[in-house]
């Protein structure tokens, strides 16, 4: 068995789905462990993979931990095996804490974002030396490449990555909602306003892949036109500063979660 999933929430299911659809994993190479044998069967059945008990984990080459961080301290002794590699997608839990709790230094830390559900995640990876040497990091890189882009970054940047990239879908959803509400205020039907806001964000994302943000802004904002007046209103409300503060607050909270361990 190449990979055992411990827990299978929204992100875990999306990772498994992407790996199966892209052919990186076959169903017979995967197992899923839930809180109870019944839950393991419920989680495994839709994907045609194997339901596991805790005793079965030792048959896996690697384990992907996809539980809530608060559940990990109690769970760790039950899933710890010296010969396995571990990949964690739990927010705020460092590689050093993973290694200590699991009594195993073959650990990879990963941070995908919500776009994993559509195969467009930006996933950060970091790993201890032992995980690199055992090719656990290479395995994780290939696994997460099935659901988006992968970035290997130093662990000291993980909280900032979480505060900016992992949280970005929520920030941008607020932007989309605010744009739509503004359109409704101007008399636009809500369904149309929501669709236009979503289309605008998607199109802007594509434009930004090949351009600096300032270039996109300048191309839209003609002298004396409507857009530059709208931008002036945003600057007057310190929208840039609000994003700075949001990323700083989320980064700080990620650090606090790690410190609590």
From Swiss-Prot:
HAMAP family: P5C_reductase
One GO CC annotation: cytoplasm
Organism: Thermus thermophilus (strain ATCC BAA-163 / DSM 7039 / HB27)
Record flagged with keyword Oxidoreductase: yes
Family label: Belongs to the pyrroline-5-carboxylate reductase family.
GO biological process, one term: L-proline biosynthetic process
MF-aspect GO terms: pyrroline-5-carboxylate reductase activity
Reaction equations catalysed: L-proline + NADP(+) = (S)-1-pyrroline-5-carboxylate + NADPH + 2 H(+); L-proline + NAD(+) = (S)-1-pyrroline-5-carboxylate + NADH + 2 H(+)
Keywords, ordered alphabetically: Amino-acid biosynthesis, Cytoplasm, NADP, Oxidoreductase, Proline biosynthesis
Function description: Catalyzes the reduction of 1-pyrroline-5-carboxylate (PCA) to L-proline.
Designated name of the protein: Pyrroline-5-carboxylate reductase
Organism domain of life: Bacteria
Primary location: cytoplasm
Enzyme Commission designation: 1.5.1.2
One of the Pfam families matching this protein, by short name: P5CR_dimer
Cell compartments where the protein resides: Cytoplasm
Pathway: Amino-acid biosynthesis; L-proline biosynthesis; L-proline from L-glutamate 5-semialdehyde: step 1/1
Gene behind the chain: proC
